[in-house]
Curated annotation (Swiss-Prot):
EC identifiers of the protein: 2.7.4.3
Name of this chain's protein: Adenylate kinase
Reaction equations catalysed: AMP + ATP = 2 ADP
GO cellular component, one term: cytoplasm
Gene this chain is encoded by: adkA
HAMAP family linked to this entry: Adenylate_kinase_AdkA (MF_00234)
Pfam families membership: AAA_17
UniProt subunit comment: Monomer.
Record key words, sorted: ATP-binding, Cytoplasm, Kinase, Nucleotide-binding, Transferase
Top EC class for this record: transferase
Residues engaged in binding ATP: 10-18
NCBIfam families per the UniProt record, alphabetical: PRK04040.1
GO molecular function, one term: ATP binding
Length: 192
């Protein structure tokens, strides 16, 4: 039986990584194993090895051609991991760059990963802005709530395009403040 490849996406600050980690812990208690792979971390490792960046948040400022090359290499590495176990790929559906939105999972990455499910984690732009302002561990750009809304809209558009190209289903999960457990239960039902 083929291992599942599930992509979990969301704008920075939406809580997708936290949601995914808590979901994997709960699934493990039920005997269901998933390996979490962060696409950005794999990309960062490749870029850092090449001396292109020093911290993760510099990734989105790389020129598009460099980002595309690094995406392809990261996709190949993750595809190899998916041969061994169920994988959740924690990533961004789109990356906001100075030159416009870049697809987080372009065709050359999708062809490698061939995901079964794409999950978009969302919440209100006000909640995202407050989370970003409260996170001193990251060097994030400050955006207006209207910019965050636009980014979430672009993520939905991109995720549906990914679904069209791969046959993956697309699920939207709301991760509202104080309701993480509800979002975890919803993601568990998608992954079982």
């Amino acid at each position: 039986m083929k291992n599942k490849v599930v992509v979990v996406t969301g704008v920075p600050g939406v809580g997708g990584t936290t949601l995914t980690q808590k979901t994997i812990e709960k699934l493990k208690e039920e005997g269901i194993e998933y390996k979490m792979v962060n696409f950005g971390t794999v990309m960062f490792e490749v870029a850092k090895e090449e001396g292109l960046v020093e911290d993760r948040d510099q990734m989105r400022k790389l020129d598009p051609d460099t980002q595309k090359r690094i995406q392809k290499l990261a996709g190949r590495k993750i595809a190899e991991m998916a041969k061994e176990s169920n994988v959740i790929v924690d990533t961004h559906s789109t990356v906001k760059t100075p030159k416009g939105y870049l697809a987080g999972l372009p065709i050359w990455v999708l062809e490698e990963l061939n995901p079964d499910i794409i999950v978009i984690v969302e919440t209100s732009s006000d909640e995202i802005l407050m989370r970003r302002l409260g996170d001193a561990t990251r060097n994030r750009d400050i955006e207006l709530t209207s910019d965050i809304d636009e980014h979430q809209f672009m993520n939905r558009c991109a995720a549906m395009a990914y679904g069209v190209l791969t046959g993956a289903t697309v699920k939207i999960i709301k991760n509202r403040d104080g309701l993480l457990d509800k979002a975890v239960e919803e993601l568990i039902s998608v992954l079982k």
